[in-house]
Amino acid sequence: MNATQILEYILQEKEKHGISRNKTITEISKTLNLARGTITRWLLLENVPAAYTFDLMKIAGMEIDYSKFDYKQKDQFFTAPDTAQKCYDIFLEKMKEFSVDTSQYLFVEPSAGSGVFLDVLPKEKTLAFDIEPRHKAVQKCDFLTYLPKDDKKYIVFGNPPFGLRGHLALSFINHSGKFADFVCFILPQLFESDGKGSPRKRVEDFNLIHSEKIGNDFEFPDGEKVKVNVMFQIWSKDHKNSKFEIKAHDETKVKVYSLSNGNSPSQQRNTAMIGKCDIYLPSTCFGSENMTCYDSFEDLPNKKGYGIVFNSNKKCYIETASKIDWASVSFASTNSALNLRKSKILEAF
């Protein structure tokens, strides 16, 4: 069964027990931390992203034999030893800044893979899990079902699977919140964004206290090298860093509209503003030369992006926008596409 079939199976089984489709869709959206409309759109288009297969199998109560899926389906890629060491060094430095005694904590590596982080984390104080252990010190366990039965203090540390738009990484963070005081993860650069729908805005119980770009050298389980654009972030329950607080932006001078004009209503957004904006910017594209200002919506890569209206000093703002290096303002996703978010645009002005 594919993801679409599994979702339909769940709905049908719930209906057999007197639970309406609407109620089940609401429950699934909460479990997956998605908008209800997203689930409804999947059903309408009969196209559920394959990345949600494991999530839906768990909801359906299906047994998962991970050996039947390849490493890309499981979103597995391993951290380079020097990257693991750098992350731990950053962590120790930040814990000193916040006067945290790390000797009082146990560490949990939730997706240990080949065990690279076990070489840098305190061996006598680290628990390591993975759905497919590749190291003798790693226990076979689905971290998303793990809850310690004691009241000890925990730090969750590692490189979780990312999932589609970071959905798996978000699940790992939020599950950690049930027992841990800190989460220290390698994450997709999407977690740097504070735009609408950003996984950063859906993190529960934690405050972001540190975030920085790190090396992009990783490895698939078969040894193939891969470049992945990532951040290392530290999230805390009890500490805050004003530098990373999400702030409201002033749109009295600059107004940013998300624009798209697809074939169906679900693919259309703010179409009335198309042709009425002062400049246009891509929301995503490949190649830094394409992440630039456009005079027309029709010229945008994929004909999707942002329209910007300047409420005063139009000539000055347009000139300023043309001089901004939008490629450097954007962030790279794991597939090297450049992404721009509304918050980043407003910050640039």
Residue spans for each PLM region:
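Class I S-adenosyl-L-methionine-dependent methyltransferase catalytic core
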Residues: M1-F349
